[in-house]
Swiss-Prot record:
Residues 31-81, 139-160 are extracellular. One of its GO terms (cellular component) is bicellular tight junction. The lineage of its organism: Eukaryota, Metazoa, Chordata, Craniata, Vertebrata. This is Claudin-4. InterPro entries: Claudin, Claudin4, Claudin_CS, PMP22/EMP/MP20/Claudin. The chain crosses the membrane at residues 10-30, 82-102, 118-138, 161-181. Keywords: Cell junction, Cell membrane, Chloride, Chloride channel, Disulfide bond, Ion channel, Ion transport, Membrane, Phosphoprotein, Tight junction, Transmembrane, Transmembrane helix, Transport. The modification Phosphotyrosine is found at residue 208.
């Protein structure tokens, strides 16, 4: 029962992490304009995402534009787009494996095979979590580096957007859920000990004089 509880918790955390990765990928809030200095137009906020950028006016009006080309993205966001998409696909594969190997499903009858499938699902979720962690941390590092770089103009400085925090949370959930599933050890097939008896040999009769 405890093993089944770990499975359910691991799958639930991994699914939440997968949904968080989708949200982080879709939200155009990876980098947000930093209002520094007097030359920044404070009446608008610029959001930069993986697929589009948005301009939010002080009146609340928002205009979004999809990137015309992949080359319009900086290098870190190009890599982030590819890695996040791979992560989402991997997580879908992990969810399917966890359904097949779940203790409450009848897709596979052998308990040992179920446990092995669940361990593979856990490894897949761990890889998906790392694929989210790398681009999010890379982008955050570039934002912080440019923010404190005196050679970068004030108008080019950005702050970390909400998508980065969502991505970190998604990575943590995927890694934690995958780790719980990896603890699902296959059952031992210990055969009961059977005592074997051999017939005692009769000693040859000795002749006494």
């Amino acid at each position: 029962m405890a093993s089944m509880g770990l499975q359910v918790m691991g799958i639930a955390l991994a699914v939440l992490g997968w949904l968080g990765a989708i949200l982080s990928c879709a939200l155009p809030m990876w980098r947000v304009t930093a209002f520094i200095g007097s030359n920044i137009v404070t009446s608008q906020t610029i959001w930069e995402g993986l697929w589009m950028n948005c301009v939010v006016q002080s009146t609340g009006q928002m205009q979004c534009k999809v990137y015309d080309s992949l080359l319009a993205l900086p290098q870190d966001l190009q890599a982030a787009r590819a890695l996040i998409v791979i992560c989402i696909i991997l997580a879908v594969f992990g969810v399917l494996l966890s359904v097949v190997g779940g203790k409450c499903t009848n897709c596979v009858d052998d308990e040992s095979s179920k446990a092995k499938i669940m361990i593979v699902a856990g490894v897949v979720f761990l890889l998906a979590g790392l694929l989210v962690m790398v681009p999010v941390s890379w982008t955050a590092n570039n934002v912080i580096r440019d923010f404190y770089n005196p050679l970068v103009a004030s108008g080019q400085k950005r702050e970390m957007g909400a998508s980065l925090y969502v991505g970190w949370a998604a990575a943590g959930l995927l890694i934690l859920g995958g780790a719980l599933l990896c603890f699902n050890c296959p059952p031992r097939n210990d055969k009961p000990y059977s005592a074997k008896y051999s017939a005692a040999r009769s000693a040859p009769a000795s002749n006494y004089v």
